Amino acid sequence: AYNEAESFTTAGCTPEDVLQLMTTIDRRFMAGLAYFLGARKLRCGVIRVGNGIPELQWDTIRRIGPTGCIVVPSFLTKLVAYAEEHGIDYRRSSLRRAICIGEALRDTAFGNNTLGAKITELWPELELFSTYASTEMQTSITECGHHCGGHVPADLILVELLDEQNNPVAEGEEGEVVITTLGVRGMPLLRFRTGDICIGYTERCACGRGTMRLSSVIGRKGQMIKFKGTTLYPPALYDILENIPGVSNYIIEVFTGSLGTDQIVLRIGSARRDEAFEKEIKDTFRSKVRVAPEVVFEPVEYIAKKQMPQMSRKQIKFVDLREQTK
């Protein structure tokens, strides 16, 4: 409870706030219960609505008037779409802040990525707070109102950023997040390698906090792709695809080619399947990351099923087949 209460405080929440929990606390999602207990610890009001069902979310907002929500940010776009379809003036709703979980909102320069920019354009009155967490951390690293990286709670976790040789990286360089938990009794971790690649900043934040700040996750160490001499991480590819009009959904597949090198296939769900659109996609990739993967068009429904297999709680956008194709 304490860790999430501190996270909410960093995001500017006070006991005067009412938070709408737009995530489940069931289906083995432990963080959902932590959010609920954290809000109670802070003495906020908290409404357990659960995930999905835009109609129920908007009915709750109308009836109770929450000031903030805890939400997977891409769901906010669905809330907006439902509101527009049903004549709800969402920009004048009671919601003023969203504590966003599970998906990145920022680039490494603290600007909005594609998802963050899209939500902000649709709903400028809603302030977005990016978070970074994992089960092993047992805490959240959360932005303050200056949105210059997530603040590490120094009384709960020790964070190091290390290179391939286990040496600390220089300020502003990418490194693997290595954590040591503090005060955890059940499963304490000493220098646990998360596999996440971030950039750390130690300069004092404008909010007055002097603890380390972390960028959004650049990628997973195990998901690094070396394609035609260029180092890529899946989130960079997601950001490009989600900014191309006409791309409804997608799955990125990586496999080992006949020469032992990484190869990328973009399986794209779209109503368009013409050569001009394929060229547009490849040209966009060349302009952003200097290389163009293979493009394969698939039915939107096929990709949707692949993204959410049975019993899956998280959407799949990246499939690593390299071990199977070596």
Task: Go through the PLM ranges and name each one.
Residues A1:
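Motif I (Walker A/P-loop) of helicase-class P-loop NTPases
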Residues L42-K326:
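Active-site glycine/GP-rich loop and adjacent strand/helix microenvironment
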Residues E4-V46:
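Conserved AMP-binding loop of ANL adenylate-forming enzymes
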